[in-house]
Amino acid sequence: MRLTSLVCFLALLFPGLLNGQEAGLLRMNPDKRNSKTHAGVWGGIEEGRFKPTHAAVFQWSAGAEAQAVRHGQKSSWTGALSFRQTTGNNMLSSMFLEPGYFPVNLLEFTPGVKSRQDVHLEGGFLSDLGYEWAAGIQGAVDGAHSAKKQDLRHSNLGVRLQVEPTLTYVMDDDMGFVTTYGFALRTESLSVENPGAAFLDKGMRYGAFLAGSGPGAFSVREFSHGLTGHFHSEEFSAQLKWIWKRGKAEGAEFGNFTFPGSTVSAFIEQAFLADEADHRYRLSYKRERDQLRETAADGNGFTADSDRVGRELELKYETRFLRGALRSIGLSLDASRWEERSFVSPSVDLTKRNLGMATVFASFSAGGILLDLHAKAGTGLWRDRGRSRDEIEDRPYRQTVDWLRQMEYLMTPRIGLGGSLKVPIPSVGGLFVQLDADWHRALKRTYMGGTNREIATLKVGYDF
């Protein structure tokens, strides 16, 4: 098996590690001079009130990253390291590091300044075993810490560990099979100064304010196992992935919860290759389900029960040009449907929401300068218990306003524009400057504080 085949499947398996350089890696030869190293620093700002309920009205962030890919005669290695510092003001709602990921949530409603630090480390290798077989492994560790030092003071420490061994069979340079097993562990440990001022969300913002006046701790952990099967040829590829999850959350002041879940995703992609342009069609499907069970104080039965089921369907078309400044142009159509059911005695509720999004994008290249542009528009519809949102009853055990703001952010009609400009500095070797910018606008607002959101990031990097 030639190393180009190994690199091909390294790009397929570890796209995050390779930083999106799959197309370039496919053309590499087994030559040490083709090894890649990248380093960069960046800073950015986000501002605007068209945002999730947990996000800052204004935030700044800065970070540094380094990535490398090395090729030997029979093996390839890759690795990356990054750090990010973020500070935002007027932050409230979820105390978790990734709000909405877990089916249980802890909320607070006093705006304040929150800071966060993220560290990411990953690495992997792929080795030729002979007789058209190759094996490899990918590993990644993420650590994050956030803290709020005023009003309801709290801090959160999170760790995510992921390991994915893989086995590859390559029939030739353009066709092969990949099988991957994945294991992941995700934990978050919350420390809250006064739990009595926090609201425990047991699903759809139903729950209760907590009792107690002393410090409290709330820990959440989740294990997941997954299997992936991937087939790839020159013009066709397909993938099926299944993930099984089981999590637990507990704390003396917060109660005990279990939350099993599963995810099934698949895609097929067909390419039509020509001398001057390639045409690619991609159809993706994803189904997620999370359940939440709260154990009663006596250990018998449940006092809360919620269920989230989501389905996403995406159709994407892209044309890649081999000549001229316009290198690619494409259209992406996305449709998703979510259902959430919550039982918090004595209430049973059901929410259904549907969202559609259309995105057009184009890529230009001239004199080493790269320009990517995109525009999008979308809208959604949702109903709570089959009623319109104006008919929702405001009950003491539900944070209705926070729920309505979050639903409006997800479902309101919107438009957006964005782009990325990368300019090389030839006089300093591989030095480059990159500017990314996005603008989002809500076309209808009732509960959110504003209709605009602007994001800008400036990066200075060096490709060795």
Specify the residue positions occupied by each region the protein language model found:
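Transmembrane beta-barrel strands of outer-membrane/channel proteins
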Residues: 39-45, 79-85, 137-143, 179-185, ...
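Outer-membrane beta-barrel translocator domains and adjoining extracellular loop/strand segments
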Residues: 49-56, 90-96, 146-154, 190-196, ...
